Regions:
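Carbohydrate-interacting regions of secretory-pathway proteins
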Residues: 327-375
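A compositional/structural signature for long, glycine/proline-rich flexible linkers
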Residues: 1-330
Length: 375
């Protein structure tokens, strides 16, 4: 009996760690939803960073140059219309953190803005013409887009969004509700997932809110094995809570190790030559390579980053985005956030050339650097 109990304790611990690593993206979306809805209800509340992003906004991987705008979309039993502005990079991800649609420069509207129709799970009604149609498997969605400054001015992008962006049920197209645009620059808020035991609480929130058909049955089975099951309360007893607390601690240090010290060549742009790593090992926004999920790549991405779209992995010059990251310097020493780091001296090292608007990586001596080629 004692041996069997130890075996089951170990089994529950293993499943807790794997549930953490395989579901961190779900918790991330739960954190995003909570942080955004603190400012107002879904569908009518739009967060605008009119004065750009700052340290009071706890987000994953934002920059302080783009003009971020975001809202939480909650579907019901009918399609929802989203009227989008031009000249933005916009994405819609579902509650499981799966890609639904692009809009703007990388979308079907080709940067001109347009009307998108988001079809909820199980909808059997007619779908009218005149919309960019996207089918989804969840009710909750994260909608985010970013505009660009014009000669250092954020107003053109902000004002265009306020004038054009609308969200409403299809049945209300003749009388759409008013949108509430909130400037959240300088306002403290947190959209980041938990890293401790409470990450399981966040995962449970999404499992309870969404149809099971939208998620992988294998993953749902893993979550059910630790007590997270749709239609049932997540109430682990003292023994199980202790095990899951330890599992979360191990999961947290594991994803940090995956991010800071990737051990597979596929994580690096130039294995053995450079520390610059790709956010999408395997080259897929779905984290799939040769038919198999890149499990470590998915976990490490969703630990530190946010936003899923094929535009981040496709080489869409002038439209999409390409990213590189590094946790160490060229000598493999960890970057220390408590220290002041010197900017890359491109004049001395000759690593920056001005050409055609692409962000690429350059190999060479002295250390590998980032080369910006742009007008």
């Amino acid at each position: 009996e004692e041996t069997a109990q130890k075996v089951y304790d170990n089994l529950d611990f293993q499943r807790g760690v794997q549930a953490y690593l395989s579901s961190i993206q779900i918790a991330s979306m739960a954190g995003m939803r909570k942080g955004m809805l603190n400012f107002g209800p879904a569908n009518t509340t739009v967060l605008l960073f009119e004065n750009l992003m700052d340290s009071k906004a706890l987000w994953l991987t934002p920059n302080t140059v783009s003009i971020y705008m975001a809202m939480w979309l909650e579907l019901g039993d009918e399609p929802m219309v989203i009227e989008t502005p031009p000249n933005v990079l916009g994405i819609i991800d579902d509650h499981w953190f799966n890609y639904v649609a692009d809009f703007g420069n990388a979308g079907p509207d080709k940067g001109k803005g347009g009307k998108f129709l988001i079809i909820p799970p199980g909808y059997k009604g007619d779908i009218p013409k005149g919309y960019h149609v996207a089918h989804t498997k969840t009710y909750g969605h994260w909608v985010i887009w970013r505009g660009s400054q014009v000669n250092g001015d954020t107003a053109p992008a902000v004002n265009t969004t306020k004038k054009i962006f609308r969200v409403y049920p299809l049945s209300q197209k003749g009388n759409p509700p008013e949108m509430n645009f909130i400037n959240v620059s300088g306002k403290f808020h947190n959209t980041i997932h938990r890293m401790d035991y409470e990450i399981f609480e966040e995962i449970n929130e999404v499992v309870q809110a969404e149809p099971a058909e939208g998620q992988n049955p294998e993953l749902l089975g893993l979550l059910a094995s630790i007590g997270i099951k749709k239609g049932q309360p997540f109430e682990p007893d003292a023994r199980m809570k202790k095990i899951l607390t330890e599992a979360a601690d191990v999961g947290a240090v594991t994803v940090r190790a995956l991010a800071a010290r990737p051990r597979e060549d596929k994580f690096y742009y130039y294995p053995g030559e450079s520390v610059w790593a790709t956010p999408f090992p395997g080259g897929s926004h779905e984290f799939i390579e040769d038919g198999a999920v890149v499990i470590d790549g998915r976990a490490y991405f969703h630990f530190y980053a946010t936003g899923i779209t094929p535009a981040m992995t496709s080489k869409m010059v002038g439209k999409g985005s390409q990213y590189a990251m590094a946790y160490t310097d060229a000598d493999g020493k960890s970057l220390d956030g408590w220290k002041v780091l010197e900017k890359y001296d491109y004049e001395r090292h000759g690593k920056v050339r001005v050409e055609d608007g692409r962000l690429v990586l350059e190999k060479g001596e002295p250390a590998t650097g980032v080369r910006y080629e742009g007008k």
